[in-house]
Curated annotation (Swiss-Prot):
Part of the 50S ribosomal subunit; part of the 5S rRNA/L5/L18/L25 subcomplex. Contacts the 5S and 23S rRNAs. One of its GO terms (biological process) is translation. SUPFAM superfamilies: Translational machinery components. This is one of the proteins that bind and probably mediate the attachment of the 5S RNA into the large ribosomal subunit, where it forms part of the central protuberance. One of its GO terms (cellular component) is cytosolic large ribosomal subunit. It comes from Hydrogenovibrio crunogenus (strain DSM 25203 / XCL-2). This is Large ribosomal subunit protein uL18. The lineage of its organism: Bacteria, Pseudomonadati, Pseudomonadota, Gammaproteobacteria, Thiotrichales. Belongs to the universal ribosomal protein uL18 family. The keyword GTP-binding does not apply.
Length: 117
C-alpha cells in the first residue's frame, strides 16, 4: 500500500466511528501549500461552514498557506463561522492525517476560539 491509500483507509475507519454520533463534523484536509476545514452537518448532507487558506481574507494575512500560522488563522475563522451558524460542539475528523503539526494547530486554535470537540 502506498501512503495515500493508507491515509484513506484510516480516514474511512474514523468516519465510520464518527458517523454514529449525532454531532456536526469538523473535517480537515491538508496539502503541501494549503489547509482546508469544513463543518459538515450531523446527517452528513450539507456543509454548514468552510474555510481555507485559498480564501482571499486569509490569503492577505499570510505569505504562505502551508505553515502553522496559516493553520491557526483557519482554525480561528472556522470556529467563528461555526458559532455564527449556531454550532457549539463538533466531532474532529482529521481525514487520516496524523494529529501533529498543522492539523494539531488548527484544532487547538478552533478550541481556543470556543469550539468544543
Amino acid at each position: 500500500m502506498d501512503k495515500k491509500a493508507t491515509r484513506l483507509r484510516r480516514a474511512k475507519k474514523t468516519r465510520a466511528k464518527l458517523g454514529s454520533q449525532d454531532r456536526a463534523r469538523l473535517c480537515v484536509h491538508r496539502t503541501p501549500k494549503h489547509i482546508y476545514a469544513q463543518i459538515i452537518s450531523s446527517d452528513g448532507s450539507s456543509v454548514v461552514a468552510s474555510c481555507s487558506t485559498v480564501q482571499a481574507d486569509i490569503k492577505k494575512q499570510v505569505a504562505f498557506g502551508g505553515n502553522k500560522e496559516a493553520a491557526e488563522l483557519v482554525g480561528k475563522s472556522i470556529a467563528e463561522k461555526a458559532k455564527a451558524a449556531g454550532i457549539e460542539s463538533v466531532a474532529f475528523d482529521r481525514s487520516g492525517f496524523k494529529y501533529h503539526g498543522r492539523v494539531q494547530v488548527l484544532a487547538d486554535s478552533a478550541r481556543e476560539n470556543g469550539l468544543q470537540f
